[in-house]
């Protein structure tokens, strides 16, 4: 499993270094005069229950089908339970989905194809796939933008950019609290929260939240 490298300040240098080195089928039902056809939700919602509060994500299955399907596989398998936000840079992003509290990296599924050329942008509260310098290296790790990071959008400096596949629709205040936590170096890792911010569970909502 690979992770995005977010170096230290200055801010622009950090972004440029990052850039150097981040379908569900339609259900078929029997004909019935009373039962409408089942149509897959084009925008699944996922709740990340964290140690600092809940974050609800709306995923764009139409514009980022591979990334959404990949993320949902990790969600439905329980992969994210007990993982942490292991890299937090206020003004830039909060990254998670790959390490446990002991900073042990979890084994992942195979990497997926980059979908950054989908028109979605790395704006504040959007969620995107983390990766290395290889554009097609994204696995389980993701990041939530806490600033408008246009340098990460397609085509970026490497001709690809970082794939946005959804956005936060509830719990923005939780994201804001996470981005402000104290951080320190831990072994080879930088910008690690001093007190672990744990993803206690990740679940797909059966229906969209009433108020977004």
Regions found by a protein language model. Give the residues of each.
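Cyclophilin-like peptidyl-prolyl cis-trans isomerases
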Residues: 2-19, 23-212
């Amino acid at each position: 499993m690979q992770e995005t490298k977010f170096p230290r300040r200055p801010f622009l240098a950090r972004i440029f270094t990052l850039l150097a080195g981040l379908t569900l089928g339609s259900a078929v039902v029997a004909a019935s005069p009373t039962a409408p056809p089942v149509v897959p939700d084009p925008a699944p919602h996922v709740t990340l229950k964290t140690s600092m509060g809940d974050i609800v994500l709306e995923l764009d299955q139409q514009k980022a089908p591979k990334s959404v399907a990949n993320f949902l596989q990790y969600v439905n398998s329980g992969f994210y339970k007990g993982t942490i936000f292991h890299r937090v840079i206020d003004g830039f992003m909060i990254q998670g989905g790959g390490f446990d509290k002991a900073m042990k990296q979890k084994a992942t599924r195979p990497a997926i194809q980059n979908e950054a050329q989908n028109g979605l942008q790395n704006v504040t509260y959007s969620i995107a796939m983390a990766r290395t310098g290889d554009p097609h290296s994204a696995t389980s790790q993701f990041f939530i933008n806490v600033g408008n990071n246009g340098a990460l959008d397609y085509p970026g400096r490497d001709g690809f950019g970082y794939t946005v596949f959804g956005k936060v629709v509830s719990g923005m205040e939780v994201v804001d609290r996470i981005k402000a936590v104290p951080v320190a170096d831990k072994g080879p890792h930088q910008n690690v929260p001093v007190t672990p911010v744990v993803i206690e569970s990740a679940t797909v909502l059966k229906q969209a939240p009433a108020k977004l």
